Amino acid sequence: MKLAYWMYAGPAHIGTLRVASSFKKVHAIMHAPLGDDYFNVMRSMLERDRDFTPVTASVVDRHVLARGSQEKVVENITRKDREEKPDLVILTPTCTSSILQEDLQNFVSRASIETEADVLLADVNHYRVNELQASDRTLEQIVTFYMEKAKSNNILTKKTIKPSVNIIGAVSLGFHNQHDIAELKRLFHDLDIQINQVIPENASVHDLKNLPSAWFNFVPYRETGLMTALYLKKEFNMPYIDITPMGIVQTATSIRSIQKILNALGATVNYEKYIDEQTRFISQSAWFSRSIDCQNLTGKKAIVFGDATHAAAITRILHQEMGIHVAWCGTYCKYDEEWFREQVKGFCDEVIISDDHGLIGDLIAKTEPAAIFGTQMERHIGKRLNIPCGVISSPVHIQNFPLSYRPFLGYEGTNQIADLVYNSFTLGMEDHLLEIFGGHDTTEALSVGISADDSLNWSDEAQKELSKIPGFVRGKVKRNTEKFARDCSKNLITLELMYEAKEKVSS
């Protein structure tokens, strides 16, 4: 556990609650003190959803600490079973309530005697995993529970006559998740592949027994769904694809993988004509990447940071499809470091694996890229440094839960990404012209560091002179001047010192 005012991935119970609240008729009981129960507010604010968040907090208070939790937890489970009539109730502690070391499995066993619904305890180690790992594990746990139940009842499922697919990993609060799933459905329709099930978003737990009817499983995001796909592969020999169809190249690779699996299973399909037609005529990004507009971005410096799936995909797109120089890319998914490094090998100068936003901020300041592609935190950092930022990954705020159709996957997603990339760069002398003519976004000279450094002061005259320098080189001038001042052991940067630094650099 660590104290932080910003986390890229939240605590484990948030991942469990995201999966639970994605299913239909599943209710989650969160065994937690006040302060850990912010999920309801967060989901209600961000998700464009008409329904209430199906999560109830069983509050750990002084009475619970004195008498124990069993009576209260069991009462909350049975009460919600009567009121909501769910198919499944999931009990999850938080990292805080886990300290009590209570036998929650015993509470679940006791409650399940009195309830119509199934009752499960989320099998997650709250000290060792984060939100993303917990969501992956919880989804696998729920699927396993209902598949084992179906086996014990001798429920056998046959494969569908036509090729079909399960889409695994559509989770509440995902980044452009609903739009991506809609685009994937459209893609599979074009390929004449039936959708067997989409889980967990709007799925019923009673339908999970039909998952093996599909010919294969499709996992668009590594963060949630991979463990479920591996379980189904092991138990039912179901092949799965985990190549994210993001960008022209990876979308084609993903479709060819589908073609290979279907042909191996007895179908006869050839999607090469479809790939060619979509790439050349339907997707706008292929010709746009060869246009003079996009060629203006060739060699521009960018950095990428986000979850493993999105950061790896965007890095590939910037380098392969748009000719943009990626100075470094990184992910906060430290547990997936090996896969991430393999995916971005040769597409960037350096790989950063960290969940420390302070380190990431300082690296961005030092790199001085023309554009940032990251999370909500990188957007904040970009605003402080006056560097434009395109948001490409969770965690995000409400701007990235749009009502309009904005997928990142499939061929329509390539258009969305091309727009985002192009519009994220400050073009030509735009920044300088805004300052000259008193534009809407005139800013004072900003520091090129995020970490606090109060050892140097600028005189009013020096600040005024610095503000006259065009924005696209101002940061470099400021950094060189401050380096010169430190070398000279000066604490105050004056106009004279600025000119001395300029002469030193010029020579």
Swiss-Prot record:
Claim: Metal-binding is one of the keywords in the record: yes
GO CC terms in record: chloroplast
EC number per UniProt: 1.3.7.7
Primary location: plastid
UniProt cofactor note: Binds 1 [4Fe-4S] cluster per heterodimer. The cluster is bound at the heterodimer interface by residues from both subunits.
Pathway(s) the chain acts in: Porphyrin-containing compound metabolism; chlorophyll biosynthesis (light-independent)
SUPFAM superfamilies with a match to the protein in the record: Helical backbone' metal receptor
Entry keywords, A to Z: 4Fe-4S, ATP-binding, Chlorophyll biosynthesis, Chloroplast, Iron, Iron-sulfur, Metal-binding, Nucleotide-binding, Oxidoreductase, Photosynthesis, Plastid
Catalysed reaction, written as an equation: chlorophyllide a + oxidized 2[4Fe-4S]-[ferredoxin] + 2 ADP + 2 phosphate = protochlorophyllide a + reduced 2[4Fe-4S]-[ferredoxin] + 2 ATP + 2 H2O
Cofactor: [4Fe-4S] cluster
Signal sequence region: none
Sequence positions that bind substrate: 428-429
Domain of life: Eukaryota
GO biological process: light-independent chlorophyll biosynthetic process; photosynthesis, dark reaction
Record: active site: 293 (proton donor)
Cellular localization per UniProt: Plastid, Chloroplast
GO molecular-function terms, A-Z: 4 iron, 4 sulfur cluster binding; ATP binding; metal ion binding; oxidoreductase activity, acting on iron-sulfur proteins as donors; oxidoreductase activity, acting on the CH-CH group of donors, iron-sulfur protein as acceptor
EC class (word): oxidoreductase
Pfam families: Oxidored_nitro, PCP_red
Residues holding [4Fe-4S] cluster: 36
Subunit structure comment from the entry: Protochlorophyllide reductase is composed of three subunits; ChlL, ChlN and ChlB. Forms a heterotetramer of two ChlB and two ChlN subunits.
Protein family according to the UniProt entry: Belongs to the ChlB/BchB/BchZ family.
Function: Component of the dark-operative protochlorophyllide reductase (DPOR) that uses Mg-ATP and reduced ferredoxin to reduce ring D of protochlorophyllide (Pchlide) to form chlorophyllide a (Chlide). This reaction is light-independent. The NB-protein (ChlN-ChlB) is the catalytic component of the complex.
Official protein name in the record: Light-independent protochlorophyllide reductase subunit B
Organism: Porphyra purpurea
Primary gene name: chlB
